[in-house]
Amino acid sequence: MGGKGADWSRRAILAGLASALAACSPGSLQWGSRSFSLPWGGDNGGGGGLSPIASAPKERFGRGRVNVALLLPLSGNAALSQLGQSLANASKLAIGFIEANPNIGENITISLRDTGDSAAGATSAANAAVVEGVKLILGPLTAEQVTAAGNVARAAGIPLIGFANNGSVAGPGVYVLNVLPETEMKRAVRYLRDQGRRGPAGIFPATPYGEALATAFRQQAIAAGFNPSAVYTFSSISEAQQIIDQAKPLIERGMIDALFIPDRASAATFAGLLAQAGVTNETVQLVGSADWAHDAGLLRNPALAGATFPAVDEAGLNAIRADYAARFGGNPPQMATIAYTATILANVNTLSLATPPYEANLLTNPAGFAGRDGLFRLYADGRSDYALVIKQIGTGGIVTTADGARI
């Protein structure tokens, strides 16, 4: 349950690491240029032999009168179900916080339901939650499952807050609470602008993950007032030298003074080739992604000293770490704070006790909400904004906060 070997990043699970989850143990997973689709749950929602999801909740916790469903994978693929149980634990921790605080009303009861590892399982769990009369659905995890459960919830007029980091599955009434590609790109691009950089460019893998980041980079760079000078894509790392050769003249002319290399698997290669070409961090600011945050090998790479990247403020995770370990054993995964935040959000008086509860205009309050990781907002199109810090890699892999948490 998030213990030894379970170094889960948000993108690792939610971007859908099909090949990695199929072939690796949790301790050996490598993130980076991966697909947004998991191998289980195609168009027909096949579950790879998954048993039908039981109609009864696996568990209930909380003592409030408003029924809220929490849909998570608790069976099926071992890696995914391990994360699902950890997020269920984080939700229980949030309920425990509510119950222990006399200044917070106990408004909700959580009904925990198993989605298994398929779209069909998510549909089944969502249907059972609707029959039970829930007012809000939290989860599921993957993009395919959020889509499946979201279709059920939307038809029933029940809002759903899923945990995928793929904004394409969001829509009116179906929200995604996570760090989306556009969120981290907006944070990083605006930081570059504030630092006086004028020519951002990017190198992205030709994968669904890379394409989503590339699209977000273009959109957010233009929104920040930049005219992106170059956007490169690659299908194989063997193309890296060619890309650097193409970028070098633009760097020399000052047209590129910041370069996004967000893909974990290739970042060190590109940084090394730039160093060999005589490009320093003073000339070109290297920028990574939130996916870099816990890759110790990457952060210790000398070629990346001085690089920056957006990340979730770890203060929130650190604040619940001891309580989680004491109650459940092991360390909470990075995503624990999202399940914790969603549970606290569901209990908010102005949302849960409204008539009717969880109306769209309430959930999309422009002021946003204070979550375990800081400020976040939900928008009418179902997407979200999440407060991020800017981290900078120093000599020897020492990482510091260059700019505090903000949206």
What are these regions (language model features)?
Residues 159-161, 168-190, 231, 301-313:
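Short beta-strand elements at the ligand-binding edges of bilobed clamshell
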Residues 20-45:
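Bacterial Sec signal peptide processing site at the extreme N-terminus
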Residues 85-86, 101-168, 267:
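Beta-alpha junction/loop-to-helix N-cap segments that form part of ligand/metal-binding clefts
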Residues 256, 268-340, 354:
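Extracellular/periplasmic periplasmic-binding protein-like sensory domains
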Residues 129-141, 161-163, 201-204, 254-266, ...:
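Periplasmic-binding protein-like
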Residues 176-233, 329:
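An alpha-beta-alpha
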Residues 327-402:
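Segments of small-molecule ligand-sensing domains
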